[in-house]
């Protein structure tokens, strides 16, 4: 598995007229497990932590390394290694049709249009979306849109997939479908979630509270800690 390292990484933001606010306290972590969960309340800093891993957010202190690559200095190279799946697939689906959206992900790696189209169709088929290749992305169900967004991420063959609350907008059936798809991946998975059943499937779970990692344990142990925080 790849190695993700946070070496004194923290995030502060400037607030006009109010100085700075700490979003994520200085954090030291080495993540090598195949399935890593991140849980915490809304606004706890868990999404900030996840976004550090592919450079969507840059640390204001310390550094983040992915297989030895500094995210702040080697952002383009890191983003080829780390695919990111957002909560709302609308943040990722920008082309008119499904096949065009996957082709967009492949535009740098496959220059020939016919070859790119063929590969995009293979990717869609792998996610049960081949019959929707020429459909508008807006005609898909919520679960299908999230699977399409994930397909676009996986098309570039990353070694790590970071999924930031990918099932928050989905019903139970689609939540199960997307979650099972994520856990079937060969890639290392970092899953930010409110779904404690999904978190329990992870090898390691980080609990984030008030901008700090307050627990770093196995899935069941970390969830028990988190539930204790919520029930205080």
What does each model-found stretch correspond to?
Residues 114-132:
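Conserved ABC ATPase "signature" region
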Residues 1-6, 10-26, 74-75:
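A short, flexible loop at the N-terminus of ABC-type nucleotide-binding domains that lies
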Residues 62-73, 78:
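Conserved ABC transporter NBD signature motif
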Residues 161-165:
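Catalytic Walker B motif of ABC-type/P-loop ATPase nucleotide-binding domains
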Residues 136-140, 144:
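Conserved ABC ATPase signature
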Residues 212-232:
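Conserved beta-strand-loop-alpha-helix hinge in the C-terminal portion
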Residues 54:
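Helix-to-loop junction immediately C-terminal to a conserved catalytic motif
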